[in-house]
Amino acid sequence: MRVGKKYKNVCIPICISQNVIKFCEEMRYLGVYVRSGLILKFNFDQAKRKFYASANGIISKVGTLKPDIVLSLCNSFAIPCLLYATEAMLLNKSERKTLDNTVRRLFMKLFHTADPSVIAHCQYYMYFLQPSDNIIVRTFNFYQSLINSSNTIVQIIFSLFNKNISNFGEKYNIGGNKLKQQLWGGLLFRQ
């Protein structure tokens, strides 16, 4: 698999012990599916499939009459399948929107509506962060854990790339202990 300007160019096959290693368009590494392309991209099809399987399993057992219980269980079991390792990825806007739409589908099923404003209000009053907001929280916590790491190698590597966390705080105008509350305050107005 290749990433960069020449990702479409044909390469000489790599051989190890007379076995040819084939180039592929997509690969799985540590549970994350990475696609070849001009820039590094991720494939969330498997993550969405696992999310839907978990959410549908929960709904089949609990039903849609108790959405608070369904959402609590989905937050514990289905959302981690969808957001696995996203805190370490630099996702573009379309990838974040794809993840948001996946959860929006769950709300459509639970509340029997397709109206975006109704879904936004349901998310707000059920205290359910969108995946894109959840990724912001997870990324911020990930950066904080790198800063506070006792491993000196991690600290050195992170200090080389520490622009990310200051840019991150400036981009979202967030920081400190009230990160979720700051994101929560603007949830309805971003729809």
Stretches with model-predicted labels:
Residues 98-107, 139-142:
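Short amphipathic alpha-helical coiled-coil/interface segments
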